[in-house]
Regions:
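Bacterial Sec-dependent N-terminal signal peptides
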Residues: 1-20
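Sequence signature of WD/YWTD-type beta-propeller architectures
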Residues: 19-301
């Protein structure tokens, strides 16, 4: 039955170029040269989290004032950093190496209001994935899931967690981790992200493109080439369509796609626009260029 669903989904043609989001202009902002990459955009669109080109450290950049605040120097902190739904807490990683030169990853939470910092996952070689839903962090380590509250009064909810293990898409639900991989285990997966309402997951299949399906693996929808996909809302995804020569990216656009197969380029050909970060509550999307430039696009549904 699953194979039939996959075949049917792959046969659905993309609806083509159509307006997915209304665009209201694009603004270039000046960020510190040492942290030119946007790691995350606050939900309310008031600040960016910036990191170095190799994802070391995190800096909070206030968009209104242009002021910066160093949050951490931790190696790897900018890779996969997560913001809580209220924008007051972050979860970031810290890479370290043992005596055998093997990498271990720890997770820390930081309250951006009071500065309180806490290690929520000790250094491990088996960290498979983590996510933030509301004010809780879900951590999958060695196929076991733990939920950490990031704020007092948090009511913990066990939503599905997705991670990549040996190029396969894994799901952890009810304390059990299993292979999910809706398009088959002969494929390689990357970039999974749960939808805001926790009913769908977007992911990318290497060499094929991005897909969305329900968290039970049904209703697979192809989205085309949309790399590093992020949910803008429960029915819209933003990502990048980049082109390279094997060494360098020479073209890239920020794309918006919906679950009906409509797609729209949000950036001009003159920019190499990469790795979008949406702030849906503020109707904004940020992105970076390989040259260290940062832009913010104003959008609306």
């Amino acid at each position: 039955m699953i194979k039939k669903i996959i075949i049917a989904a792959l046969a659905i043609p993309l609806a083509g170029h159509a307006q997915v989001l209304k665009t209201g202009g694009m603004k270039k902002i000046t960020v510190p040269a040492e942290t030119p990459s946007v790691a995350a955009f606050s939900p309310n669109g008031d600040f960016l989290l910036l990191t170095s080109p190799v994802y070391d450290g995190l800096v909070k950049y206030n968009i209104a004032t242009g002021k910066t605040e160093k949050l951490t120097d931790a190696p790897g902190a900018g890779y996969g950093v997560k913001l809580s739904g209220n924008g007051e807490n972050i979860v970031y990683r810290e890479n370290s190496y043992d005596k055998n030169h093997l990498r271990n990853v720890a997770l820390h939470s930081l309250n951006l209001v009071n500065g309180k910092r806490k290690r929520i996952s000790k250094p491990s070689r088996n960290l498979q994935g983590y996510s933030v839903e509301g004010t809780q962090a879900s951590i999958v380590n060695n196929s076991r899931k733990t939920i950490k509250a990031l704020a007092s009064g948090t009511k913990k909810t066990d939503v599905p967690s997705f991670a990549i293990d040996n190029s396969q898409l894994m799901i952890t639900r009810g304390g059990k981790t299993t292979v999910f991989s809706p398009n088959g285990t002969d494929k390689s997966y990357i970039w999974p992200e749960l939808s805001p309402d926790a009913t769908k997951v977007v992911y990318y299949v290497a060499g094929i493109g991005a897909f969305v399906c329900n968290v039970d693996g049904t209703q697979i929808v192809p989205l085309g080439i949309v790399r590093a996909p992020k949910w803008y809302d429960n029915s819209t995804i933003v990502g990048m369509k980049d082109e390279d020569d094997g060494e360098h990216v020479y073209a890239s656009k920020i794309m918006a796609v919906d679950l009906n197969g409509n797609s729209q380029a949000l950036t001009p050909d003159s920019l190499i626009a990469m790795y979008p970060q949406p702030a849906q509550k503020a109707n904004k999307i940020s992105f970076s260029t390989p040259g260290g430039e940062t832009y913010i696009i104003n959008v609306a549904k």
